[in-house]
Structure formats: C-alpha cells, structure tokens
Amino acid sequence: MLKKFNEYFIQAQFEPIKSFYLKGDLNRKFWNDDDTLDEEIREQLIRIGEDFYEGLEIEGEIVDIAFCGSLCNYNWSEYSDIDLHIIINFDDVNKDQELVEKMVDYAKKVWNEQHNIQIKGFDVEIAVQDEDDLKDSISGGRMGGVYSLLSGDWIKKPSKDDFTPDEDLIRKKATTIMKKVKGLEDDFKSGVEYDDLMDDLKKVWKKIKGGRESGLEREGEYSIENLIFKLLRRNGYIQKIMDVRRKAYDKQFK
C-alpha cells in the first residue's frame, strides 16, 4: 500500500506536464469568436490596472495596459493567471531604471498579496513593465500573444505553433532539481549552518531562474528550461525553496 501511495505521489508531481500541450482554440470564456476580448472583461481589467497605478502615486503616464500570458495564447490551462501589465516609460519616472524596477516590483508584490481578484475563475496578477522591455520581449520571442486593453486590439496575435512537450526530458531534468530541493529541506531540518544553506539554495535557484531566462532568450516560451520552471512552480517546488529560505532566516534568531 505504501509503495502504491509513493508511486501515486511521485506521478502527481509530474501531472502539470499535461498542461503544456497546446489547445486548439483560445479560451472562449475570454475571447469572442473574432478573437477580440469580451468587452466586460476588458473594462474590468482596465479599471484594475488604473486603480493599481493610481495607488503608486508616481510620475509618468500609462502608455498602455496589456493582457498577456497563456490566456492570450493556445497554451492556456487550469494553472493560467490573467497577466495584467501596466506599460509605462521608466525614464518618465526616474532615469535610474533599476530603482524604478525595484519600486514597481515591490508595489506589485504587495498588491498581489493583498488582493484576491478572480475573473472567470482565473487569478489576476498585476505587474508594471517598461515600454521598451515589452517591445524587446515581443521581438525576442519571449512573449506570445499580447493584447492592448486600451485600444482593444492585438499588439501581437498568438500563433498556432506545432509544438509537443518532451515529457521524458522535462521529467528527467526536473527530477534532478527536485532532488536538490529535497536536499535543501533535509539540510534545514538537520541544522546546517545558515550561510552554507543559503549558498546551496542560491545555486539551486540560479540554475532554475538562470536556466529559464536563457531558455526564453534562445527558444522562447516553449523552451525546455521555461517548461521546467513552470512545472516546478505548479507542483509546489518553487514554493518549497521560498519556504526554506524564509524558515532558515527566521530560525537564526531563536
């Protein structure tokens, strides 16, 4: 019985791979037959975006409010979020773009933690993006479909790509990382020194995050590294890393 349970548990960790297969159509809860966004949803998303940005109280006009991510593509699934990007020119806020990025990232994190907005059963995740970064992400293939909420038209229409995920390769590479994450959890429980644990954690995180970034640059959203990142996020292993980091930090002061 225990063996069967373990086999089922292991299999369940890879179940999100099934969500990587492309759909034959866009999600019709959101999109009309002519692939324009449902008007009520468009108005709701604009309001959310404007309310968020107004709360930032920073200089700089909104260039656009973009709907992007898997719900604007054929790879949508039960794990999808409504990715809502407020597009601005960072230079209009401050010439120090790194400072602006840190500020809006923090504001995004606070907003997403404080709000639990769902539309058609999907969570709304808000972010602020520089106009030039959006253009670079689109031209570089790092983003699929992108829809302008302000103009009510596609900035980039999604394409029906001929893609099949390599399940065996995803499992193999993800398993290696998952074992390392399990090792981090074991090290924390056994009392490994904080600095040593953080060094190992940073190496694991660099492999995951750095791999994803290089994969997106090289092959776009269907790269094996990006799919591994999505699997680890969907099966809870990204959260495990965050939990170890938080618990290890807190434990220093006990």
Model-derived segments and spans:
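Catalytic core of pol beta-like nucleotidyltransferases
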Residues: A12-S80, I87-K254
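Short acidic, low-complexity intrinsically disordered linear motifs used
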Residues: M1-A12
